Swiss-Prot record:
PPR-type repeats, residues: 145-179, 180-210, 215-249, 250-280, 281-316, 317-347
Signal peptide: none
Gene: PCMP-H63
Key words, A-Z: Mitochondrion, Repeat, Transit peptide
Name this protein carries in UniProt: Pentatricopeptide repeat-containing protein At4g32450, mitochondrial
Length: 537
């Protein structure tokens, strides 16, 4: 599905004027604000645009509970060895804390967890392994002399074996031992990355039994974990049960909605946040731009960008500009995104983002043009895939895919299938069940989108090729093997095709089962023939 729109083709006259006025502002924004390209600066610079926070808050001046807050920096991810993108331990300018109650201190060499009573602190060593620093007070970790040691648990976590890690901490609890919070947060992150919902529920129980309801940071991590698992309902239950919330709490639930294809709910949550008298920060606006991109509502996003600096006095940083390029280009507004990038001072982040997204939408000419600009600005950004005209695969995506494979333990079955292969008896059974279901689909209006079958074959063969797509067999297999009315989950590492998207909606409606389908783009929540993406992904 390619969305390539002409410049301003979907904008009304009023919106065109607003759009033109906004670009006029942006064309000189970098110069007027004294903004510099962060790639040209000191990599250890702690200025607000470098760390992603704006409006003068960089966390370097604020003190809480006797500890000075550090600028927003993080240690290496214990699994990938790279800077983590999760938000479990962010502190920035105290976004994760309820003022005066809870303190987190993080820098590039260690991660410390400070309990609310200021008595016990936890951290990680340089290799990402949690360690305990006892200063009296509460202890969440006891000496353990069972079959598995803490070192073994850390090793299992580093290998991404989520199920095994959860089994170990469950067995320890049965023996009367409790795992410390840093390790629980670590495992929670792994559950979210691996989309291991059942294990996530166990970790949720462990965390809540270790902290009080007032520990906002812990509950924020649970929301983020459920967001990664695609369980909006569980994340929302946690959110609604919290007596107190901070900026990161609201940010997390907005991100959860957007990440799961529910952009309108994300915008509604943002409106509720403001109605309750809260003031957003620069980080929250990035989530709003993401939600508007999910909705494909460029005008809504531009209005929020306008309000960011006019109503709240937040000075845009490069991360905001990159978010705007994504908001415009991901729905297919490539001409508008190009105009936006051209209005700014040349910046490799903007051109690289547009290069990748234009190639995703099949605009190879624009992609090559952006590649030339990236090469001029910083040739080191181009890897082998980029130079070949492909969209580079992020190392973080490879790590997550590895975690998802490792999350499958002994209680998971594996079916070997190829398109159209019914040589195995179990595959033949699935094929016949799916064929029967297809007849019901046709009765309620299903028409195969044969244009998506690219092989040069006759019409019947094209329809059959679409019929044999693997996610349909995954659906029918899960339907036959699970209890009635239970939720069906289908995870895929490729973008779902439009025909399968239509088919899965109808299949879900016919069998009366809610379906959560995860493709390379986003989560699709399907129920009663309607998808949360609203036919846009």
């Amino acid at each position: 599905m390619i969305y390539t729109l002409t410049r301003g083709s979907l904008l009304g006259s009023t919106c065109k004027l607003r759009y033109s006025s906004l670009f006029s502002y942006l064309s000189t924004a970098a110069l007027r604000l004294g903004f510099e390209n962060p790639t040209n600066g000191n990599p250890m610079d702690n200025s607000s645009h470098h760390i992603g926070y704006v409006n003068g808050f960089n966390g370097g001046e604020q003190s809480l509970g006797g500890f000075q807050q550090n600028s927003y920096e993080q240690s290496l991810n214990p699994v990938s060895g790279q800077n983590p993108t999760n938000r479990f331990y962010q502190n920035g300018y105290n976004r994760n804390q309820s003022y005066g109650e809870h303190s987190e201190i993080i820098n590039q060499r260690n991660q410390n967890w400070q309990s609310s009573d200021g008595c016990s602190s936890y951290g990680t060593t340089g290799n990402g392994v949690p360690q305990e620093n006892n200063t009296g007070g509460n202890h969440f970790q006891q000496d353990h002399s069972g079959h598995s040691s803490l070192d073994e648990l850390d090793s299992i976590c580093r290998e991404g074996k989520v199920k095994k890690a959860v089994e170990i901490i469950k067995s320890w609890r049965n023996e009367g031992y409790v795992v410390d919070l840093p390790r629980l947060f670590w495992i929670a992150q792994l559950c979210g990355d691996a989309q291991a919902l059942q294990e996530a529920k166990v970790v949720h129980e462990f965390i809540t039994s270790s902290v009080g309801i007032s520990d906002i940071s812990a509950y924020n991590s649970i929301i983020e974990m459920y967001s990664g698992c695609g369980s909006v309902e569980d994340a929302l239950t946690v959110f609604n049960s919290m007596p107190e919330r901070n900026l990161e709490t609201w940010c997390g639930v907005i991100r959860c909605f957007a990440k799961n294809g529910q952009g309108e709910d994300a915008i509604d949550t943002f409106s509720r946040f403001k109605q309750e008298g809260n003031k957003p920060d620069g980080e929250m606006f990035k989530e709003i731009f993401f939600a508007c991109g999910v909705l494909g509502d460029m005008n809504e996003g531009l209005l929020h960008f306008e309000s960011m600096y006019k109503e709240y006095g937040i000075i845009p940083c490069m991360e905001h500009y990159v978010s705007l390029v994504k908001m415009l280009a991901e729905p297919g507004y490539l001409d508008e995104a190009l105009r936006f990038v051209e209005s700014m001072e040349p910046n490799v982040d903007l051109w690289e983002t547009l290069m990748n997204l234009s190639r995703v939408h099949g605009d190879l000419i624009l992609g090559d043009r952006c590649q030339d600009m990236v090469e001029q600005l910083d040739a080191s950004r181009l890897n082998k895939e980029s130079k070949a005209g492909l969209v580079p695969v992020k190392s973080s995506d490879l790590v997550k895919e590895k975690l998802q494979r490792m999350a499958k333990g002994p209680n998971y079955g594996i079916r070997y299938m190829a398109a159209g292969d019914i040589s195995r008896p179990e595959n033949r059974e699935l094929y016949m069940a799916l064929k029967s279901l297809k007849e019901h689909m046709i009765e309620i209006g299903y028409v195969p989108l044969s244009k998506l079958a690219l092989h040069d074959v006759d019409q019947e063969s094209k329809d059959e090729n679409l019929f044999n797509h693997n996610e349909r067999f995954a659906f029918i297999s899960t339907f036959l093997d699970t209890p009635a009315r239970s939720l069906i989950r289908v995870m895929k590492n490729l973008r779902v095709c439009a025909d399968c998207h239509n088919a899965l909606k109808l299949m879900s409606k016919i069998v009366g089962r809610e379906l959560i389908s995860r493709d390379a783009k986003r989560f699709h929540h399907m129920k009663d023939g309607v998808c949360s993406c609203r036919e846009y992904w």
